Amino acid sequence: MATIKVDVVSAEEQIFSGQAKFVALPGEAGELGILPGHTPLITRIRPGAVRIEAENGEEEFVFVAGGILEVQPGAVTVLADTAIRGKDLDEAKAEDARKRAEEALQNTGSNLEYATAQAELAYATAQLAAIQRLRKLRGQH
């Protein structure tokens, strides 16, 4: 079966590099599915889960907080603002961050504080959704 080279990198480190049969991720206009030979594309990525079906059939999950996606017929590059391996996601921390952001929204004094709290809430909510999606795909409840 045909494969495509996939690289997921953040400012801190390379998160994934390898051959894959399929990649799914949250694009700016909705969920994107990428197969080998995909038409070239550059788009922004929304916070959420990147699912990579590796060459050996195993699935890799990476949470991204946004970034840029570049697709070429033989390569996919995800340049993430922040990226966390699925196995390293901490549900308790994400839930705590969500609660703090919701409280901050209630107690903001300026537009800047409100915008910051909104961004933090969106990040935590996307992280929790990625954790739930990962758990569902792995058959855990």
UniProtKB/Swiss-Prot annotation:
Assembly mode: F-type ATPases have 2 components, CF(1) - the catalytic core - and CF(0) - the membrane proton channel. CF(1) has five subunits: alpha(3), beta(3), gamma(1), delta(1), epsilon(1). CF(0) has three main subunits: a, b and c.
Family matches, as InterPro entries: ATP_F1_dsu/esu_C_sf (IPR036794), ATP_synth_F1_dsu/esu (IPR001469), ATP_synth_F1_dsu/esu_N (IPR020546), ATP_synth_F1_esu_C (IPR020547), ATPsynth_dsu/esu_N (IPR036771)
Record-level Gene Ontology MF annotations: ATP binding; proton-transporting ATP synthase activity, rotational mechanism
Keywords: ATP synthesis, Cell inner membrane, Cell membrane, CF(1), Hydrogen ion transport, Ion transport, Membrane, Transport
Topology of the protein relative to the lipid bilayer: Peripheral membrane protein
Descriptive protein name: ATP synthase epsilon chain 1
Cell membrane in keyword set: yes
CC annotations in GO: plasma membrane; proton-transporting ATP synthase complex
Organism: Paraburkholderia xenovorans (strain LB400)
Stated family: Belongs to the ATPase epsilon chain family.
The keyword Transport is assigned to this record: yes
Gene: atpC1
Function (record text): Produces ATP from ADP in the presence of a proton gradient across the membrane.
Cellular compartments annotated: Cell inner membrane
Pfam families on file: ATP-synt_DE, ATP-synt_DE_N
Major subcellular location class: membrane
Alphabetical list of Gene3D superfamilies matching this protein: ATP synthase delta/epsilon subunit, C-terminal domain, F0F1 ATP synthase delta/epsilon subunit, N-terminal
